[in-house]
Amino acid sequence: MSVTPIEELPSLGDALEDAKRAASYRAVDENLDPAKHRVVGIGSGSTVVYVAERIGKYQASPELKAKVEFICIPTGFQSRQLILDNGLRLGSIEQYPEVDIAFDGADEVDPELNLIKGGGACLFQEKLVSTSSAQFIVVADSRKRSPQRLGTSWTRGVPVEVVPSAYVRVLRDLHGIPGCRSAQLRLGEPGKAGPVVTDNNNLLIDADFGPLEDPAALHARIKALVGVVETGIFAGNAAKAYFGSADGSTQTLAR
């Protein structure tokens, strides 16, 4: 397909953006197959901007334009806008509950491909789309790759999406889980007075458990609390992760 190879692209003039673009473009180039991928999940965050951009370039290429139309499923307001801005067809998870492939970013990735997500407050919809996908691909710059356990590089805690009326109880219950160092409601300051509100009109709590010995077990423990909608621990469903560097190179982690 007639898209410019990554190696031939000029620098964006920002090393971090070059890294994000490299990871995203490489992930799309190596995994998106128009012959079998029609429904595509588009995640949230600053790195996924380049995923939508690359898929948009493929969709606009003469080889694909008249033959295949990707249907892109957003994980929130931002990704919905990315889909539209790149000339892609917008779908919904209600219309297409089975997603062929999904691309999303991460706040931290451990050596076992477990993730912490939710720094951008879209974690429930991100998990809905990623777990509905036959193949889930993670894109990030190299800072997000942790050589050790989750919670080593990302030190802001595990994001927990909660029903607004339950946040006080959930805060109390989180403090009762062994290993919880702190738990606090995420505030929107300085841009917004009051708490951060998710696209689902829920609130977010950030719960610090330090480095996580068993991410799946902690997710299950938190998810069982009354009032919890979802956690930002993504354990076991990512197939591959791409990490971009400032020089345009990428590293890959796969199951």
UniProtKB/Swiss-Prot annotation:
EC number, UniProt record: 5.3.1.6
GO function term, MF aspect, one: ribose-5-phosphate isomerase activity
Signal sequence coordinates: none
Cellular component terms (Gene Ontology): cytoplasm
Record flagged with keyword Isomerase: yes
Keyword list, A-Z: Cytoplasm, Isomerase
Cellular compartment(s): Cytoplasm
Keyword hit for Cytoplasm: yes
Reaction(s) this enzyme catalyzes, per UniProt: aldehydo-D-ribose 5-phosphate = D-ribulose 5-phosphate
GO biological process: D-ribose metabolic process; pentose-phosphate shunt, non-oxidative branch; pyridoxine biosynthetic process
SUPFAM superfamilies, sorted: D-ribose-5-phosphate isomerase (RpiA), lid domain, NagB/RpiA/CoA transferase-like
Pathway: Carbohydrate degradation; pentose phosphate pathway; D-ribose 5-phosphate from D-ribulose 5-phosphate (non-oxidative stage): step 1/1
UniProt similarity note: Belongs to the ribose 5-phosphate isomerase family.
PANTHER family per UniProt: RIBOSE-5-PHOSPHATE ISOMERASE
Protein name: Ribose-5-phosphate isomerase
Organism: Eremothecium gossypii (strain ATCC 10895 / CBS 109.51 / FGSC 9923 / NRRL Y-1056)
